[in-house]
């Protein structure tokens, strides 16, 4: 990379990019360069691309190797070769063809320029709304368009000099006396002398007015007029009042524009071009397709059109002494229209089309819109190794894991799988490895799991409004076609499971993988970076699930609070529990010795999720409230008795010793308790291993 480009844009030093007007001197500095023999190159003079017979770039053409660099690294147009970066190799360029021995990647950023034979107005600043040229000059856009396209003349304010015409202000070219007589009075050079002395038209007239503009005085005058209109009382005429309001709004916009020019040290006359930059060749390529046919970027054809017309105008101004002035003005208008088409095709009406009636893509078409260079390539990049699918809940996943469908996973990690197949001598080359992947051999999934075990992925949900909109996860293979996600991470993505889609990206570089593991994993982003509140909290589906899980049937409280049968007889230890009476009681008023029996009964559909049941609990007096008195006491024939409370039941012996404690609960409560207990035990194990 050359030093000029490195100083202009350096991704490590510059974190932002500003687009604005540039001076002709800066355009010349970007485009021109001095060869070691002292020759200055950079100006594109010919509208040709490649020579037909040799298939080499035309000298001083749109793909000239002297201007933009060699097509092949270290090889000049003559075919000579030099080692790039070897200081012992002399000379650094070919003395015969003038091509430098540098890397061919220089053709991606080295620019050229076209020296225009007449000034040309930048159509973005003239025709786009708002028209910056019309705003800063405080003139109607129709009047300025008439000047630019040679439909009007502008009489120069000459004083103390004899004039051919005693005229001032704006003159319409369509007046018969001007159109038929004045240009015919002069030859080409004579008409140029007359025009340069007394009248002005074309973009040159606009440039002169912009150059004569004093920005500070314009700002002061606009401010004074705005204050005057603000202090002026309304006259009661609605049309006049609206006109004054529109004028005040225009003055505000004009003052903001002038302040921007002053603040950024930009000269207004830079909106009129005298040098036209030429894009690097790699950004407007010519590609050879099957059959030997060539496909060229539309920009090349638009550049050729500009160069053709500009060269014709140059010939008229320099070689032809007897050319009528009217023909010169017509040619200047054609140059202006060609540059307009290059910058924004169709902005002045019907767009330019090729032989197949297809509209040419101009600069504006390339950079604007959703598929333009900025939104598609620079801002919303479509990257390789990425996929997209609908998200569903993965209840068995850990917080830092996501379920990746096999079809998406094999596409994302295909290069890594191919590499491991070749390393393990399971495939001799890339073609054989791809055939194994297409056939989905069992070994493929084993290697894929090994690759995924050491490679995180990034999940992103648009719009990415904050940094938690993209997080890292450890992928696991799942069946189906959808992404599985832990529900607790949904709040950071502002996602739910009603059809939302997420994009999957694979970090390739070591820096990206390290950042994903150390900073972007979901279990490391539990707090909101904005306010510090927990971000991984139950939402929507989880809240509904927790409510259903912990709800119970309050209507059956009294019937399940006690039983007339002998509790000890009804325990699973008793051999008589298999009789029909015991089975009938177990079905209607269930008692369980442990949580596994309760969940087993639920799975066998003997009880419902919210059905009240009695679960034997460990002898823990913390469940007993000292102030609570039993609702009922049942005495059994063997001397034991049961104390029934609101939410628990105590079985005591004859000596009032606690034999059993039963808690009134549901299968939903039991399931939630077991999940919480497992989570606490897992956290304790992780904490003890870290310490």
Curated annotation (Swiss-Prot):
**Among the entry's GO cellular component annotations, what is one?**
plastid
Q: Which UniProt keywords apply?
A: DNA-directed RNA polymerase, Nucleotidyltransferase, Plastid, Transcription, Transferase
Reaction(s) catalysed (UniProt annotation): RNA(n) + a ribonucleoside 5'-triphosphate = RNA(n+1) + diphosphate
Instruction: State one molecular function term (GO).
Output: DNA-directed RNA polymerase activity
Q: Tell me one Pfam family matched here.
A: RNA_pol_Rpb1_2
UniProt KW Iron-sulfur keyword:
no
Task: Name the coiled-coil region(s).
Answer: none
Q: What is its EC number?
A: 2.7.7.6
Q: Does the keyword Nucleotidyltransferase apply?
A: yes
EC top class, in one word? transferase
Task: Kindly state a single biological-process term from the GO annotations of this entry.
Answer: DNA-templated transcription
Q: What Gene3D superfamilies is this protein classified in?
A: 1.10.40.90, 2.40.40.20, RNA polymerase II, clamp domain, RNA polymerase Rpb1, domain 3
Q: Where in the cell is it found?
A: Plastid
Function according to Swiss-Prot or TrEMBL: DNA-dependent RNA polymerase catalyzes the transcription of DNA into RNA using the four ribonucleoside triphosphates as substrates.
Complex and partners: In plastids the minimal PEP RNA polymerase catalytic core is composed of four subunits: alpha, beta, beta', and beta''. When a (nuclear-encoded) sigma factor is associated with the core the holoenzyme is formed, which can initiate transcription.
Entry similarity comment: Belongs to the RNA polymerase beta' chain family. RpoC1 subfamily.
User: What PANTHER family does this protein map onto?
Assistant: DNA-DIRECTED RNA POLYMERASE, DNA-DIRECTED RNA POLYMERASE SUBUNIT BETA
Return the protein name: DNA-directed RNA polymerase subunit beta'
Q: Which organism is it from?
A: Cuscuta reflexa
């Amino acid at each position: 990379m050359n030093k000029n480009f490195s100083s202009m844009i350096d991704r490590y030093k510059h974190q932002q990019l500003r687009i604005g007007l540039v001076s002709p001197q800066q355009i010349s500095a970007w485009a021109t360069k001095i060869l070691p023999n002292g020759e200055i190159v950079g100006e594109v003079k010919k509208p040709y691309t490649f020579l037909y017979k040799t298939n080499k770039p035309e000298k001083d053409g749109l793909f000239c190797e002297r201007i933009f660099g060699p097509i092949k690294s270290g090889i000049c147009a003559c075919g000579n070769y030099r080692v790039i970066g070897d200081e012992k190799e002399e000379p650094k360029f070919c003395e015969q063809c003038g091509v430098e021995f540098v890397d061919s990647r220089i053709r991606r950023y080295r620019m050229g320029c076209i020296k225009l034979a007449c000034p040309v107005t930048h159509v973005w600043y003239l025709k786009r709304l708002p028209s910056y040229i019309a705003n800063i000059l405080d003139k109607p856009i129709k009047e300025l368009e008439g000047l630019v396209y040679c439909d009007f003349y502008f009489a120069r304010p000459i004083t103390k000099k004899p004039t051919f015409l005693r005229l001032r202000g704006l003159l319409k070219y369509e007046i018969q006396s001007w159109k038929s007589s004045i240009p015919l009075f002069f030859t080409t050079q004579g008409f140029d002398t007359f025009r340069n002395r007394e009248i002005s038209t074309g973009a040159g007239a606009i440039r002169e007015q912009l150059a004569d503009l004093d920005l500070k005085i314009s700002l002061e005058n606009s401010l004074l007029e705005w204050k005057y209109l603000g202090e002026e009382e309304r006259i009661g005429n609605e049309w006049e009042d609206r006109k004054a309001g529109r004028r005040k709004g225009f003055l505000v916009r004009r003052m903001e524009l002038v302040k921007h020019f002053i603040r950024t040290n930009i000269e207004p006359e830079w909106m009129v071009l005298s040098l036209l930059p030429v894009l690097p060749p790699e950004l407007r390529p010519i590609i050879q397709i099957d059959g030997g046919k060539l496909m060229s970027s539309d920009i090349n054809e638009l550049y050729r059109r500009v160069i053709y017309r500009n060269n014709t105008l140059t010939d008229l101004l320099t070689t032809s002494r007897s050319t009528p002035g009217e023909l010169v003005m017509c040619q200047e208008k054609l140059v202006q229209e060609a540059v307009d088409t290059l910058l924004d095709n169709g902005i002045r009406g019907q767009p330019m089309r090729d032989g197949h009636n297809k509209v040419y893509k101009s600069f504006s078409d390339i950079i604007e819109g959703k598929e333009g260079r900025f939104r598609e390539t620079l801002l919303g990049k479509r990257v390789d190794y990425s996929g997209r699918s609908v998200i569903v809940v993965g209840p068995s996943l850990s917080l830092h894991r996501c379920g990746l469908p096999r079809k998406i996973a094999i596409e994302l990690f295909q290069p890594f799988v191919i590499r491991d197949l070749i390393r393990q001598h399971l495939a001799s080359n890339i073609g054989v490895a791809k055939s194994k992947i297409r056939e989905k051999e069992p070994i493929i999934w084993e290697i894929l799991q090994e690759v995924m075990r050491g490679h995180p992925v990034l999940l992103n949900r648009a719009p990415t409004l904050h940094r938690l909109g993209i997080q890292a996860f450890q992928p696991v293979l799942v069946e189906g076609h959808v992404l599985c996600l832990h529900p607790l991470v949904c709040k950071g993505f502002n996602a739910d499971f009603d059809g939302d889609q997420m994009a999957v990206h694979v970090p390739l570089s070591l820096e990206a993988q390290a950042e994903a593991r150390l900073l972007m994993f979901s279990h490391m982003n539990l707090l909101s970076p904005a306010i510090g509140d927990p971000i991984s909290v139950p939402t929507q589906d989880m809240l509904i699930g927790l409510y259903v899980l912990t709800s119970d049937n309050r209507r059956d409280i009294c019937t399940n609070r006690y039983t007339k049968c002998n509790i000890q007889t009804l325990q699973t230890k008793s051999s008589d529990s298999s009789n029909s009476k015991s089975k009938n009681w177990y079905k209607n008023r269930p008692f369980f010795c442990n949580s596994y029996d309760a969940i087993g009964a639920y799975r066998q559909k003997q009880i419902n999720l919210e059905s009240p049941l009695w679960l034997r609990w460990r002898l823990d007096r913390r469940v007993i409230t000292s102030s609570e008195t039993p609702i009922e006491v049942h005495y059994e024939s063997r001397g034991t008795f049961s104390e029934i409370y609101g939410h628990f039941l105590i079985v005591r012996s004859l000596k009032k010793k606690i034999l059993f404690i039963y808690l009134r609960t549901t299968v939903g409560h039991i399931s939630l308790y077991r999940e919480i207990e497992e989570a606490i035990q897992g956290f304790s194990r992780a904490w003890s291993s870290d310490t």
